[in-house]
């Protein structure tokens, strides 16, 4: 369960990171991206572990609120599932249609940018 939560928070952070403050960005990057402990972050910023913990929880809530309103992550995952399904269908049904396969690959590349 913790792994899924971390994956979700990291994904939301990737989408909504520009909307966060510098402090929120720093704490999130260190904790989720660089695997710092609360104590290490607290020491780095000369604050208490509780302050770091509280900031991280508030930021997680903010990220979830953004997602609830904007649905960027949800729509991204839905598009990826659809693209995977299309790619599998084309590969199975039209394996020799090079133009169609290039078009599907082009769509996939757009999502990765």
UniProtKB/Swiss-Prot annotation:
Name the InterPro entries on file.
RNA_pol_sigma_r3/r4-like (IPR013324), UPF0122 (IPR007394), UPF0122_fam_protein (IPR054831), WH-like_DNA-bd_sf (IPR036388)
The family database entries (Gene3D superfamilies) matched by this protein are listed as:
Winged helix-like DNA-binding domain superfamily/Winged helix DNA-binding domain
> Per its database record, what is this protein's job?
Might take part in the signal recognition particle (SRP) pathway. This is inferred from the conservation of its genetic proximity to ftsY/ffh. May be a regulatory protein.
Give the family this protein belongs to, as stated in its UniProt record.
Belongs to the UPF0122 family.
NCBIfam families noted in UniProt: PRK00118.1-4, PRK00118.1-6, YlxM
Q: What's the protein called, per UniProt?
A: UPF0122 protein LVIS_0949
Q: Which organism is it from?
A: Levilactobacillus brevis (strain ATCC 367 / BCRC 12310 / CIP 105137 / JCM 1170 / LMG 11437 / NCIMB 947 / NCTC 947)
């Amino acid at each position: 369960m913790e792994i899924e939560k971390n994956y979700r928070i990291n994904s939301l952070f990737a989408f909504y990171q520009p909307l966060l403050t510098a402090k929120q960005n720093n704490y999130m990057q260190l904790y989720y991206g660089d695997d710092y402990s609360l104590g290490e972050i607290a020491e780095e910023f000369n604050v208490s572990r509780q302050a770091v913990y509280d900031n991280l929880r508030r930021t997680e809530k903010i990220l979830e609120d953004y997602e609830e309103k904007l649905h960027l992550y949800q729509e991204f995952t839905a598009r990826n599932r659809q693209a995977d399904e299309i790619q599998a269908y084309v590969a199975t049904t039209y394996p020799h249609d090079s133009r169609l396969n290039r078009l599907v690959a082009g769509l996939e590349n757009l999502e990765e940018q």
